[in-house]
């Protein structure tokens, strides 16, 4: 997502006004009513911590969990998914390198998934603090992770695709422009070619590409930097060498939701 923001700012816009990361999927898992496709620890941290929004005139601020719902139409046959504010690092990183007015991150969790997370929080099962149960001292969140299925072993039961992308609004050649830059992982493909379910594979492939660019010297820098600091073109080219390609979708005017 950070790389897409960098590419859009450098190649698709004269002015960037707003960057909105939008991730969603149409994944289903046979035999489970609730089975996160990622670590429940990470899921709870991202979804139950207050989401962060960045605005140039206001800086960073938090909002309510699952706030500002909007329906986003994802490409590659995924279709419409309701997305809500979720805490994620792009909101903190992108404004450091991309001149814009607003940055958000929204994820397509689905109403049922949100209800599960709210129930865990209500029951205290999201807590990291250990409690005494008989002679054992345990963290409720560790118990939750132990009873839920291992996401890495769900691939053979999963169907569908997951999409990670960046929706950018701004000005190009004197006219308003909105584009969605995205990467789609099909679970059938990732299981067949890599032996990994789509969500985990999509999460892992980008750091692998970045490390290769650093190792080869195509990316060079001193200090601590996010992906949006670097030239996006070598990254996107190498991503294609891993038999996985990105897309760019022109969005119609007026499709950007009001804050």
Model-flagged regions — what are they?
Residues 1-12:
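Active-site-proximal alpha-helical scaffold in enzymes
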Residues 11-259:
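C-terminal catalytic/substrate-binding lobe primarily of soluble NAD(P)-dependent oxidoreductases
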């Amino acid at each position: 997502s950070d790389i897409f923001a960098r590419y859009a700012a450098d190649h698709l816009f004269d002015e960037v006004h707003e960057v909105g990361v939008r991730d969603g999927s149409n994944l289903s898992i046979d035999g489970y009513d609730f089975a996160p496709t990622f670590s429940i620890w990470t899921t709870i941290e991202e979804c139950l911590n207050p989401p962060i929004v960045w605005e140039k005139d206001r800086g960073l601020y938090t909002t309510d969990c699952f706030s500002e719902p909007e329906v986003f139409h994802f490409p590659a046959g995924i279709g419409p998914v309701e997305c809500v504010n979720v805490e994620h690092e792009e909101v903190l990183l992108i404004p450091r390198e991309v001149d814009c007015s607003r940055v958000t991150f929204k994820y397509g969790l689905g109403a049922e998934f949100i209800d599960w997370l709210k129930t865990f929080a209500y029951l205290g099962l999201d807590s990291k603090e250990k409690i005494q149960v008989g002679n054992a001292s345990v963290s409720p969140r560790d118990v939750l992770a132990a009873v839920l299925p291992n996401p890495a072993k769900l691939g053979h039961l999963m169907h569908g695709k997951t999409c990670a992308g960046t929706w950018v609004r701004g000005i190009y050649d004197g006219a308003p422009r909105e584009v969605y830059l995205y990467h789609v992982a099909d679970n059938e493909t990732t299981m067949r070619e890599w032996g990994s379910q789509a969500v985990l594979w999509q999460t892992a492939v980008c750091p692998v590409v970045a490390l290769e660019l650093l190792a080869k010297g195509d990316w060079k820098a001193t200090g601590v930097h996010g992906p949006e600091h670097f030239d996006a073109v070598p990254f996107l080219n190498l991503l294609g060498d891993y038999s996985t390609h990105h897309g760019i979708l022109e969005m119609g005017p007026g499709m950007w939701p009001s804050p």
